[in-house]
Amino acid sequence: VGGGGKTTLLYAMASHCAQKGWRVLVSTTTHILRPENGLWAKTDAEIQELWARGSYAVVGSPAPKGKLTAPPEADLAHWMAQADAVFLEADGAKHFPCKAPAEQEPVLLPQSNIVLAVAGLSALGHPLKECCFRLEQACMLLDVPPEACLTPELLAQLLASEQGGRKRVGSRAFYAVLNQADTPQR
């Protein structure tokens, strides 16, 4: 959940686990970019073929703009039961490095036992109105105006809040992931 490179992180983690010989499934409960590397599987046979090749399999129903949406619930449950590891993207951020969840977000499945809240460090030092998806919710949660610059403290508050990164986590394991740390300043 969150912003700042969820999909990239998801695919990197899936690749890492697949390289260990695990049967890895990637999907979404909302929308995700369709992979361009031939890893989108539409049938049981395609999933098994990808796993046999030592790759991960991405499942989902076609959606506009090169995306996938959640596959039918019964299909997803069937495929999840066959996998050693499952990675699900559970909300969207429109490519913003940070976000606050909407009323209906995140869409976590009961089977999910770990939640990662992702934020991009590229947002630090920028006004919320420039770097945060669902600006109104973020401003209310943080009690700051849209012009307020995102500080490490505000980002931590956003990630740790039960109305922010920890929303709907409940008793699941929770980790905050700070990415986009690819410059000396970050």
For every predicted segment, state its role.
Residues 1, 24-28, 58-61, 86-90, ...:
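General beta-strand structural signal in soluble alpha/beta enzymes
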Residues 102-124, 141:
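Inter-motif core of Ras-like GTPase G domains
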Residues 90, 120-121, 141-147, 158-161, ...:
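G-domain G4 guanine-recognition motif of GTPases
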Residues 1-14, 18:
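Glycine-rich phosphate-binding P-loop
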Residues 61-100, 105:
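Phosphate-binding/switch loop-helix module in NTP-utilizing enzymes
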Residues 148-168:
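A short, acidic, amphipathic alpha-helical segment used as a generic capping/interface helix at domain edges
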Residues 44-47, 133-149:
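Acidic, Ser/Thr-rich peripheral helices and adjacent loops at domain boundaries
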Residues 14-66:
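N-terminal phosphate/diphosphate-binding loop that engages ATP/GTP or pyrophosphate donors
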